[in-house]
């Protein structure tokens, strides 16, 4: 294949000036063969299995990074939802499993490990309930473990009992990690229609339909797209902007696929998916909000933001799907408040509210992500925010999620500092009117008519 010198220079510019990188190489590992009634034996099986599969993951990605000159920011692992594989154990909680995952993550040198998870969209088994009730302490005593719970799906409806429970779990997680800015909540996400091959944290888990061991890759390129849109000459129409984004997404995706396939080949693992998601960072310019403003919005969150985000999300998918036959995961545009310099600025200047973020989640990749709210926000209000987001996902047959941080002691206008890629989050206002009676009714919101597809 002939590569033009201009293409090489263009790629170097993307990496050096526009923050292009591989955000994550995530190894998915099946733990189904680790089940055992004795918890100590189970934990030993899990630890040995992870080390056997992932012992060369970090070294291999570093070699690939040196070979291609392409930064790989995170190396991660996802495992089979622990609520499924640990249910065979005779134990009151699963905190020891979280400690085992954390120990394996430290030993392999990876950044995060996901899969302390439960899938409860239609109901909870005893194992699901044990895992969910273990989440606050598990996230408080570990450093690298991430947790997720799927509460709803288009086919099953919304498990409102689990939604109500998760409001309390999030509050307790914030309390137990209050001395660290409620960091536990940044490692906990709830889903509707959770994908089984997502490489991004905190929602990554290795689905039961996945291979024994698989490599999934997530690419990051908001800075590249932002530079491309701002570099358009004259007065481009929105159609011109969409075409520009599509072509840029194509280039980004090809690079990610090349890296992912080579990592999988060297590790003798199956190549899974390439997640097209535009994942921002706190760096100036590496921002989804900045792309929306480059289209002509004065500030992200003003009227027109949802339309601009829909254009961006669709163009990224079209360009990426032309570049790879293995597109999966979440694949769209992330709008995490704390991780996006432009979003942070928009919240501080008053153009972006929680309600507008909810509207934006109807057309983008995931949902309400890394949103800080006052520390005294009631559990029922957190559950109601989750229920709204689950409804959007259920009705629209898409993945939606909530990662919300009720940081203890904070009020609207405060800033919660997380550091690193997690950035900092301005505390946003929630409605003062109660939804406690609604949430307290429990039960299940039935699946919509859209579920009847056969």
UniProtKB/Swiss-Prot annotation:
Highest taxon of the lineage: Bacteria
Gene3D superfamilies: 3.20.70.20
Pfam family, any one: DUF711
Entry-linked CDD domains: RNR_PFL_like_DUF711
PANTHER family, per database record: UPF0210 PROTEIN MJ1665, UPF0210 PROTEIN SPR0218
Subunit: Homodimer.
Family stated for the protein in its record: Belongs to the UPF0210 family.
Identification of the protein by name: UPF0210 protein Ppro_0613
Organism: Pelobacter propionicus (strain DSM 2379 / NBRC 103807 / OttBd1)
